[in-house]
Amino acid sequence: VGFKAGVKDYRLTYYTPEYKTKDTDILAAFRMTPQPGVPAEEAGAAVAAESSTGTWTTVWTDGLTSLDRYKGRCYDIEPVAGEENQYIAYVAYPLDLFEEGSVTNMLTSIVGNVFGXKAXRALRLEDLRILPAYSKTFIGPPHGIQVERDKLNKYGRPLLGCTIKPKLGLCAKNYGRAVYECLRGGLDFTKDDENVNSQPSMRWRDRFLFVAEALFKAQAETGEVKGHYLNATAGTCEEMIKRATFARELGAPIVMHDYLTGGFTANTSLAFYCRDNGLLLHIHRAMHAVIDRQRNHGMHLRVLAKALRMSGGDHIHAGTVVGKLEGEREVTLGFVDLLRDDYIEKDRSRGIYFTQDWVSMPGVLPVASGGIHVWHMPALTEIFGDDSVLQFGGGTLGHPWGNAPGAVANRVALEACVQARNEGRDLAREGNEIIREASK
């Protein structure tokens, strides 16, 4: 009989160092720490097997399909320099393993089950290569960077935002008042915090109404287009779309979603709604550190960012890089480019394991936020460039004279830095001097 039952090593089937990757493969780079006594080849093969067609034993139904066509393959393993017992395992997945247009299915396949496999003590997905034939099946950002600039009529500089604090406890009217002060002072956007949904102290409908009033008042007074990220995240997809619909009816230009806690299915639904109804979509990454904080286990933020670009979003939070280590800066800039650019070359020093070609998929604006203030402005302008949103929460609202003067300070600092850069001055060296001159 042709079928031979029993358990055999994964590497006999799934470790294929002679394999030449195809243009139709999705490629993954896993950082793995094998269990003591498990060879790296076996651990890499186990990862490839468990995230594609394999199971722990041979099954007779394997004979009813073409394993060679469908199996994932671990095609290369390299030790991580400076780390004991850590390896990068490269795995190629045939395109037929994935449903078109579903980030949910892609992540369920690649990382859904394999992180509990016995052979690996720890596992981290560092990067994915998404081929154009697959990325073309996704909606991508509802509008993208250029369309957003045209809608807002704002060019040649980063955009400015501010998260309204305290995040919970204000009534809707005072919340709207804080929004108005910031926008009147010169910010482009204000923002609901990620956990502001519809709590007893401030129901979503009341908040939306007072914020819309603040928006239009600030627009009339400044002559600029203003926005507030109205958080449409809700307990059900239906409720989320209901909130986005109300925002559209009020004439708001942008809504917001917590894409990891809300889930990729909900996010893609909202992205379709936003594209069909002319709403921009701001994405918050709440819960990301649960997944990406550990250096040897989980998923790197660049994978979550790639997944978001496919699922749909016009802005996404991307950390700040200010005051971090040099290496961190390069890695952060690497995935910022993955969000914005059409074509990104492989560059291991920036954490980019594969060349990524997004073809014509629109870009996402990276949002720098978290503990930044006016004195960081020269560094932020230099690092992030024009296509970004700089978001100052306490850096605006913490101004001793209040919200509007805080917003003015940010806008003046930004305009000064952009002008200095355009004049060819060195922001890194002269930054503090530029800010001092501007504040007179």
Curated annotation (Swiss-Prot):
The disulfide bond which can form in the large chain dimeric partners within the hexadecamer appears to be associated with oxidative stress and protein turnover. GO terms for cellular component: chloroplast. Its cofactor is Mg(2+). Mg(2+) binds at K191, D193, E194. It is an enzyme of class 4 (lyase). Substrate binds at N113, T163, K167, R285, H317, S369. It is found in: Plastid, Chloroplast. The active site is at K165, H284. Its main location: plastid. Gene3D superfamilies: Ribulose bisphosphate carboxylase, large subunit, C-terminal domain, RuBisCO large subunit, N-terminal domain. Keywords: Calvin cycle, Carbon dioxide fixation, Chloroplast, Disulfide bond, Lyase, Magnesium, Metal-binding, Methylation, Monooxygenase, Oxidoreductase, Photorespiration, Photosynthesis, Plastid. CDD domains: RuBisCO_large_I (cd08212). NCBIfam families: PRK04208.1. RuBisCO catalyzes two reactions: the carboxylation of D-ribulose 1,5-bisphosphate, the primary event in carbon dioxide fixation, as well as the oxidative fragmentation of the pentose substrate in the photorespiration process. Both reactions occur simultaneously and in competition at the same active site. Heterohexadecamer of 8 large chains and 8 small chains; disulfide-linked. The disulfide link is formed within the large subunit homodimers. The basic functional RuBisCO is composed of a large chain homodimer in a 'head-to-tail' conformation. In form I RuBisCO this homodimer is arranged in a barrel-like tetramer with the small subunits forming a tetrameric 'cap' on each end of the 'barrel'. This is Ribulose bisphosphate carboxylase large chain.
